[in-house]
Curated annotation (Swiss-Prot):
One GO process term, biological-process aspect: DNA repair
Modified residues (N6-acetyllysine): 105-106, 140, 1191
Similarity comment text for this entry: Belongs to the SMC family. SMC3 subfamily.
Transmembrane segments: none
Name of the protein: Structural maintenance of chromosomes protein 3
Highest taxon listed in the record's lineage: Eukaryota
Residue ranges the record marks as coiled coil: 179-350, 393-503, 669-916, 958-989
Keywords: Acetylation, ATP-binding, Cell cycle, Cell division, Centromere, Chromosome, Coiled coil, DNA damage, DNA repair, Meiosis, Mitosis, Nucleotide-binding, Nucleus, Phosphoprotein, Ubl conjugation
Residue ranges occupied by any SMC hinge domain in the UniProt entry: 530-642
UniProt subunit comment: Forms a heterodimer with SMC1A or SMC1B in cohesin complexes. Cohesin complexes are composed of the SMC1 (SMC1A or meiosis-specific SMC1B) and SMC3 heterodimer attached via their SMC hinge domain, RAD21 which link them, and one STAG protein (STAG1, STAG2 or STAG3), which interacts with RAD21. Also found in meiosis-specific cohesin complexes. Found in a complex with SMC1A, CDCA5 and RAD21, PDS5A/SCC-112 and PDS5B/APRIN. Interacts with MXI1, MXD3 and MXD4.
Domain notes: The flexible SMC hinge domain, which separates the large intramolecular coiled coil regions, allows the heterotypic interaction with the corresponding domain of SMC1A or SMC1B, forming a V-shaped heterodimer. The two heads of the heterodimer are then connected by different ends of the cleavable RAD21 protein, forming a ring structure.
Post-translational modification: Phosphorylated at Ser-1082 in a SPO11-dependent manner. Acetylation at Lys-105 and Lys-106 by ESCO1 is important for genome stability and S phase sister chromatid cohesion. Regulated by DSCC1, it is required for processive DNA synthesis, coupling sister chromatid cohesion establishment during S phase to DNA replication. Deacetylation by HDAC8, regulates release of the cohesin complex from chromatin.
Amino acid sequence: MYIKQVIIQGFRSYRDQTIVDPFSSKHNVIVGRNGSGKSNFFYAIQFVLSDEFSHLRPEQRLALLHEGTGPRVISAFVEIIFDNSDNRLPIDKEEVSLRRVIGAKKDQYFLDKKMVTKNDVMNLLESAGFSRSNPYYIVKQGKINQMATAPDSQRLKLLREVAGTRVYDERKEESISLMKETEGKREKINELLKYIEERLHTLEEEKEELAQYQKWDKMRRALEYTIYNQELNETRAKLDELSAKRETSGEKSRQLRDAQQDARDKMEDIERQVRELKTKISAMKEEKEQLSAERQEQIKQRTKLELKAKDLQDELAGNSEQRKRLLKERQKLLEKIEEKQKELAETEPKFNSVKEKEERGIARLAQATQERTDLYAKQGRGSQFTSKEERDKWIKKELKSLDQAINDKKRQIAAIHKDLEDTEANKEKNLEQYNKLDQDLNEVKARVEELDRKYYEVKNKKDELQSERNYLWREENAEQQALAAKREDLEKKQQLLRAATGKAILNGIDSINKVLDHFRRKGINQHVQNGYHGIVMNNFECEPAFYTCVEVTAGNRLFYHIVDSDEVSTKILMEFNKMNLPGEVTFLPLNKLDVRDTAYPETNDAIPMISKLRYNPRFDKAFKHVFGKTLICRSMEVSTQLARAFTMDCITLEGDQVSHRGALTGGYYDTRKSRLELQKDVRKAEEELGELEAKLNENLRRNIERINNEIDQLMNQMQQIETQQRKFKASRDSILSEMKMLKEKRQQSEKTFMPKQRSLQSLEASLHAMESTRESLKAELGTDLLSQLSLEDQKRVDALNDEIRQLQQENRQLLNERIKLEGIITRVETYLNENLRKRLDQVEQELNELRETEGGTVLTATTSELEAINKRVKDTMARSEDLDNSIDKTEAGIKELQKSMERWKNMEKEHMDAINHDTKELEKMTNRQGMLLKKKEECMKKIRELGSLPQEAFEKYQTLSLKQLFRKLEQCNTELKKYSHVNKKALDQFVNFSEQKEKLIKRQEELDRGYKSIMELMNVLELRKYEAIQLTFKQVSKNFSEVFQKLVPGGKATLVMKKRRXERQSGLRMKEKGVVKGERGSGPQSSVPSVDQFTGVGIRVSFTGKQGEMREMQQLSGGQKSLVALALIFAIQKCDPAPFYLFDEIDQALDAQHRKAVSDMIMELAVHAQFITTTFRPELLESADKFYGVKFRNKVSHIDVITAEMAKDFVEDDTTHG
């Protein structure tokens, strides 16, 4: 076993968690500068293992915590991991960790992460070979110097610690304490014995007079017994007579109470009926108010529908007249349009003919004019150009321009032709689209009418269902009121039951229910929920006749909780306490109840109570535990006999009990407060309430829910229909808008057609003129340049002038005729388009908007709805009349019940008066019985006070009369007065003191034996202590000589035990704490040597090996003293070896040669034990197996594994690694 690893955090200079690399199992050396934390590392190990840090005050614990920059450390720990492969520690693990944690208010040990006590840790270390008597497996700084300069007595003390004499001294202290205590007891016993001897002598003289006194006293007690016994028998006879009378009176009282209870039951039943009827009246009145409100609402709806129907009828009538007028106007418009179109048809051919002539004349006029212009231009070019070539050049240029202009004109003409053709095509397409839209419009109108009809059908159905739902709501309200009344009745019964039960028990039941609800909400402990079965009272039934006896027998056990097992009850109680709930609970765990079969007596006068209970067989143990040992008997006499004969509890039906132990209990029991009766009423009310709720849920609420669903479906249908209606109406509006747009486009196209045609004619005329000019220029090209026209050209110009004048005159005539005809056409077309056709469109639109069919549908739906609302009004009024009749009948029933209530009240009062009278008589008998019982008790008390009597006292004076008995008693009392001075207790005192004397003598002998045993034990302890010191001295002395010779070759050293001079051993010396030997001591023990003769352990050494040069410690130098002290430490460790050693700078005062010797010694010892040392010298490094360096930076220590070379650097120049 050895230290494998050390982990430090927050301890002294080690702030951060420092995990030291695993140590070697042999020699480990730690090096570092002064103040770097080497000693703190040793302190950390000592902090866990040593007794030195066992009892720390808070300020001492705080002093061990790291103090430096940064946040303050609030706790620290040191953990040592041991290699336990040799199983030296009694733990079956190869590695064992031991951690100590401290803080300002805590100091804890953890063994393998489990908390343990300080004693556990110390015992564990001792079992591994760490001796409390030898603390030298850890040698701190200065310990060597301290030992080197210690006196001889200090070394003797050290030797005694190594020898383990502390245990002997502790045992000796205990023995001395026991001896003191024993001596005190012996002295007290001697004093008591002396007093008892004196008292016995006095009592011996008083015994003779006491004998005479006892003779007369015995006679007196016999006479008094006979007198008291006769009085007791007379009193008993009177009590029996009184009991018979009371029983007769009690039977009468029971009959009266039963009659009174019947009257009260009847009254309660009548009260219940009255409450139910009043609740029914309240419900009917509330329903009537609802019906009245509904009727008012229905009348409002009916009025609205009537007005709506009238408006629709008026509207339909007005629409019909307007439609006729519009149709008539439409017909007139069509006739006028036809007339105007006919007029237009007659005018247009004339207009077209004139226009065509005019266009030809204009074209010819333009052509002639152009030709004439060309001829005049030809004449002018003679003076314009100087040569033929110049003219030809200009003509060619003009021809080129004319060609381009002619091409442009042709393109324009072609474009207008194309535009006119497109206009015609669009006109046809527009007409087709218009006809298609007109067809679609008719289909949409039909679909809208169909949706309107369907909407009103669904709406009527929805209104019918709403009426049915209103009726069901009224029914539900009535049922709810009945339910509330039933719930109130249940709460009253539960309150009565709670009043008859203790608060603690009730709180317990409520708390258990809360625990189970908590389990159910969390979905946990299902087996606990299934394993809980409620209280005893809820798990059985019996006939009402047995309620009293059953309830008296069970008592509060009626409220015990039945569970399957103790595990279930434990789980419930754990949660019960966790939730800190109030109350008192008692469980009956079926798995723990030990119930045996009972042999019941076979008799007609009694039956087992359990046979009259009905319960689930699985709870048999629980009910046998509560009721299994009880019989129901016919009378108290039978109960008394059976209880004595069969050792069973017996009870009558009235609740009078006879315990098998002999106790009798009973009396009047108020059955009105029977908890079983109340529980039965509660259960019945709960069942009725459950039935009402089930009826409400199964019938009404289900139907209401069904109707609600149907209404929701119908509302959805109505919404869907409304959506479709909006969709189709939007489609209709869209079609109408599109038709209007198409018509406007067609009219616009017709308006632009004629201007385009005129533009085409103008372009064609212009084209002819251009082509004529081109032909003229081409003809002129190449001809001679002339200043005058040729004869032929001059003739042509004259002809053209004549033709132009004629054409201008004709064109003026044609223009006037065309303008006249065009005015007629324009006027007719304007009248057609702007007046007749526009008005026709308006008429058509008004006709479409009338929607005669749609208005009829709305009227039909409104009429149907009006019929339905009339029916509902009629039904509501009929139901209201029925309710009035029912209320009258119910109020009459309440009056009859109240009359009956008065009769039963009077009857109950009569019974009450009779009971009160009987109670007074019973009280008188009770008072007399009390007096007799008191007299009986007095007689019995006086008989008991007489004490034990001889047998003859019971028979000797039985024949004498009371007068004779009193005469004899007077004689006895006279004789007894003569002995009034006699000590009546003399004999008893004599016997008592004699017994005390014997006990004290025995106790004295026991104390003497104990005293002797303690003396013997002390002698044995003293001898063993002496032997242990002697043996330890021999071993340490031998080891010391051997070790010194190894450390100082050729040297010699011995230990010398120093004794007192002229000390003589004269037995056991008891000087500790002032104790001396007692009178009965064991005498002198000259054979037992005392360790007190030893005064110290001296050391004699010679570094040369010569006998004559042996010197004491005081004569040695400092280094020699340190070496001798080290030798002594090694010797002690050899005597009492530990698994590992920690040496802190033990070579500080040694020279190089001796340091080398110490290093060799450690190497030799490291074969069997682990060494962890610190040093500033290189010699110890040579024997080391592993090296560690400690650094101190920022006030924090760090320890790491280093190489041998680095360790030597530390030793040679520690500033390099500071």
